[in-house]
Amino acid sequence: MAKPFDVSKFRKEITKSIEGLSIGYNDPTDWISTGNYGLNYLISGDFNKGVPLGKVTVFAGESGSGKSFICSGNLVRHAQQQGIYVVLIDTENALDEKWLHALGVDTDESKLLKLNMAMIDDVGKTISEFMKSYKAMADTDRPKVLFIIDSLGMLLTPTDVNQFEAGDMKGDMGRKPKALTALVRNCVNMFGSHNVGLVATNHTYASQDMFDPDDKISGGQGFVYASSIVVAMKKLKLKEDEDGNKVAEVNGIRAACKIMKTRYAKPFESIQVKIPYETGMSPYSGLTDMLEKSGALKKEGNSLVYTTEDGEILKAFRKGWEANKDGILDKVMLEYSGKTKSVISNVTTPTEEVTE
């Protein structure tokens, strides 16, 4: 009779022989809110989660679509509220301290380190040196850290610089996509078993394929494969006043967000998030439309209706729902999350224990 396989012995052997080997599962334990409940849900499957540490997330979109607002503003603010240290790498030379303060970001170096870089190699070296020091720390001393690169599209390769100095503008001939892919791939491997995450913004360009109208992300597809979450964003004009009435002038933008890739929820779902110039993003923006599309809210005349599990009927006009009148959306989110979790638990075997 063959001897049973000694897993513990094998684990000890490979742990000793392979430096930096991580064994077991690395499920995210820390999540950072995007500042919008609907977007959080489409990314992570939970209204209060959002972007995880230990993974790479990319927000890609055209200029002015709200990428920096969400990544360099909302994510940084919520990370700081959770005690997560933020390293903000500004490649566009566009993030002013006054603008960050207006979004509620604490720019003190004890909570935020802002670096201005232009070279892909410099960004890679910075992250690599940080991770060497990070791994040398005792487990109890390791902080939770979020890297934000705003943006990948503006990063340069040494070839770009050399050609520019020589007056040669033919471009890097495909070196940049390879360098970006290498950067993201290395980050994925370095961050996997640690409470360190990367969020990056990137640019998009119009698709030339009539059968695939979605905008294409610049820099190739390599880093898209390596990323855990990819959100595509498009800029639309917001022509509404504070009460939601239609007006002629533009008072903000509507960020149309489409989840191109996620490992925590159903992909290719979309939401429109309103960002007025005067008041900023509401955490409830787009949530009413999302719940109606999912079938949770039913239309009755000019009202939207939600029936709770206890038979209570929550009914209000659309503007009442969008304004979260009397906390009506909070009630729905609380129960809707429970329904989603119960569906997940029902598809497991009776002997399995479902944990969050």
Residue ranges of each PLM-predicted region?
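A glycine-rich helix N-cap at a beta->alpha junction
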Residues: 108-121, 227
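Charged, alpha-helix-enriched surfaces in structured cytosolic catalytic cores
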Residues: 5, 30, 34, 38, ...
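C-terminal regions of RecA-like/P-loop NTPase motor modules
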Residues: 1-22, 32, 238-356
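Phosphate-binding/switch loop-helix module in NTP-utilizing enzymes
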Residues: 118-193
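Catalytic P-loop NTPase motifs of RecA-like helicase/translocase cores
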Residues: 95, 155-156, 207-208
